Amino acid sequence: MNQNLALSNGRIFTEYQVLDNHAVLVNRDRILAIVPVSEIPGDFEVIDVQGGNICPGLIDLQIYGTGNDLFSAELTVESLSRIDNNLLKQGCTSYMPTLATNTLAVFKTAIDVFRKAQSKVALGLHLEGPFLNPAKR
């Protein structure tokens, strides 16, 4: 399978502009460049996105779960992995799994699970207080 892909025939949204007649060059999980369609290298497999939008991955800084998975209800590596995969399919490339105010024991379990999971998508944990502050316990 070719690891060099050119996403073309779509609208490309960059930080500053919207580009037509361009392609996004990708190798594995890295964006290499945005080039005019006429400059797509010969060793790239062209993927026609059929007029779709091409934009940077989205980031969600407070998410409790996705689909049937609620992280605080199932504090497991498997649950976190399912959340990762579901969010990636939806265009969310980074996120913060969130736990609502809870017991210290639940927070400690969540931290342990997060460390074991070694997620490449989750940026860290969002733990809601006020019980993180010793003076408020």
Predicted regions and their residues:
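Active-site metal-binding motif and surrounding structural segment of the metallo-beta-lactamase
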Residues: 39-55
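N-terminal metal-binding scaffold of metallo-dependent hydrolase/deaminase domains
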Residues: 1-40
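Histidine/acidic-residue-rich, glycine-tolerant segments that coordinate divalent metal ions
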Residues: 103-137
